[in-house]
Design a protein with these regions (language model features):
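Post-DEXD/H (motif II) to motif III coupling segment of the RecA-like Helicase ATP-binding lobe
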Residues: 1-6, 180
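Conserved RecA-like P-loop NTPase helicase motor core
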Residues: 22-24, 83, 87-172
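Conserved helicase motor "Helicase C" RecA-like lobe of SF1/SF2 P-loop NTPases
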Residues: 50-78
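Gly/Ser/Thr-rich loops at beta-strand to alpha-helix junctions
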Residues: 7-8, 54-59, 169-172
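Conserved interdomain hinge at the start of the Helicase C-terminal
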Residues: 15-58
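C-terminal/domain-terminus segments
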Residues: 158-194
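Phosphate- and divalent-cation-binding pockets in alpha/beta enzyme and binding domains
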Residues: 58-62, 96, 174-175
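Short, acidic/turn-prone active-site loops that include or flank metal/cofactor-
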Residues: 4-8, 78-80, 91-92, 111-115, ...
Length: 195
């Protein structure tokens, strides 16, 4: 008997759960939406789950709420999760530590990695572009976010996991199509089925 082991092809379609009509991250109902959807995604999936959110306050609030329900399975920015654990982290932490973690069964994108204007460096760069009359979002913030996506999802492609995007801007903004194009090839998941 002969067996050939190889890594999954990186060009196989990635299953993506991204419902239409999700709230935007700056709305009052978004935190509750994020908690409810994350809970559903975690309950229906065996294996490691990562939740990516750059907003510190929202991420810590979600971590606390998920830990209240799922206990010690939920950790914040830890490289030693349980096999069916949940790691909440920001995008930079995930990109820096993904080699130290097992391949995830799913990635939950709470918020797309668009830099916040609360960051002084980002704010200064945007202000300079505004003064020059440039489209600072499409010239600076969107390309930076799009450049992070392939590296962030590569382990998921190799493991055959699924991607869930809970940021309403994906379907609610015209530039959301650019994000979906960056994720190609992918197939839509209309429903969440337990693993």
């Amino acid at each position: 008997m002969r067996a050939t082991l190889r890594e999954r092809e990186l060009n196989e379609p990635l299953p993506i759960y991204a419902p239409r009509r999700q709230p935007l991250p700056n709305t009052r109902i978004y935190a509750q939406h994020l908690l409810e959807e994350s809970r559903r995604l975690i309950l229906g999936q065996a294996g490691l789950t990562l939740v990516l959110i750059n907003d510190d306050q929202l991420r810590r609030q979600l971590t606390s709420s998920l830990a209240a329900e799922f206990g010690r399975r939920v950790v914040h920015e830890s490289t030693a999760p349980e096999s069916n654990g949940v790691v909440t982290c920001n995008w930079d932490w995930w990109l820096e530590h993904q080699e130290q973690l097992p391949a995830p069964a799913q990635l939950i994108v709470g918020m797309l990695p668009i830099a916040s204007l609360d960051n002084p460096l980002t704010s200064a760069r945007v202000e300079r572009m505004k003064q020059q009359g440039e489209d600072w979002f499409r010239t600076l913030l969107l390309p930076e976010a799009l450049s992070l996506i392939p590296t962030a999802i590569a382990p998921l492609r190799r493991s055959g996991g699924r991607l869930a995007i809970l940021d309403g801007r994906l379907r609610g903004r015209s530039w959301g199509d650019q994000v979906l194009n960056r994720l190609e090839p992918w197939i839509p998941l209309q429903r969440l089925l337990p693993e």
